[in-house]
């Protein structure tokens, strides 16, 4: 049976890992064994944080909507309930953007909501 020399594949694999570790500090970028551990840890953080990002942004949108709604004299929960009753189907991302960028439009939305809540 012939002998298999794996220097080329090992070098390619090491090169790939070290390329992913580019920008890391200290031996984490230049020592293969340490870089491999750092890259594996980075990948787990990456996977976890893609999911966390969705929760974080939803929380941010809710905080922004609540702040804008309270400045108009209505709480977040009553505002969202009023939107539901009025049949206005805007998601939290769009509502937060309107609250930040277009105060007049958000005020008109609040007026519609107050009308629904009073009825």
From Swiss-Prot:
Keyword Methyltransferase annotated: no
Pfam families in UniProt: Ribosomal_L20
UniProtKB keywords: Ribonucleoprotein, Ribosomal protein, RNA-binding, rRNA-binding
Classification via SUPFAM superfamilies: Ribosomal protein L20
GO MF terms held by the record: rRNA binding; structural constituent of ribosome
Top-level taxon of the source organism: Bacteria
UniProt xrefs under InterPro entries: Ribosomal_bL20, RIBOSOMAL_L20_CS, Ribosomal_protein_bL20_C
Record field: transmembrane: none
Gene Ontology biological process terms in this record: ribosomal large subunit assembly; translation
CC annotations in GO: ribonucleoprotein complex; ribosome
UniProt similarity note: Belongs to the bacterial ribosomal protein bL20 family.
Function comment: Binds directly to 23S ribosomal RNA and is necessary for the in vitro assembly process of the 50S ribosomal subunit. It is not involved in the protein synthesizing functions of that subunit.
Protein name: Large ribosomal subunit protein bL20
Species this protein is from: Acidithiobacillus ferrooxidans (strain ATCC 23270 / DSM 14882 / CIP 104768 / NCIMB 8455)
